[in-house]
Amino acid sequence: MIYLIFLSPNIGLGESVEIYIRDQLDENRGYCLDIKGYKLKAKITNGLQAHTCYSYQGEIAVDQAFDSLKLTKNIFFLPVFDVCMESESIAVSATIRLNKCNYGKLQQFKLDIKGRIYPSSDIKLCLTVEQGQSKKGRGGSPVHLKRNLTLQPCSNALRPYQIWSTRTSN
């Protein structure tokens, strides 16, 4: 007998991790990569932002949950929404969005041992949290904070806004 096995791209998922900026900046709960919107109601068409990490509530929120196994393959995959992090281009000030996973150049990012996240095709551009004053979200107590994300030149001056880590929960 011959058995055919069809593999879904989601078979072999790793555990969920949140990706957070190591410097807490102005948010003692920390900032995590987050789909704009609220948890399951998040809208993938609105892209990614840095937002108060939800793990202070005891678990990783679905709109901040990345697949740890795919991260090792340079893919920032959000399994609940079946989308990947993508840059609009490989250029300074490019925004970060979400799209169906195609594993193309715009979706390949590396998280290196120094904590930098950069496009696999350009080690000199880092995923960067917006500087300046954060914006208030709509929920949380105290109110959650959020900031935009772009690609910027990797630099020591921007280190607090460019160094990331992963964790399974707080």
Name each model feature, range by range.
Residues 11-170:
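Lectin-like carbohydrate-binding module/patch detector with strong preference for beta-trefoil
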Residues 1-11:
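Classical Sec-dependent N-terminal signal peptides that target proteins to the secretory pathway
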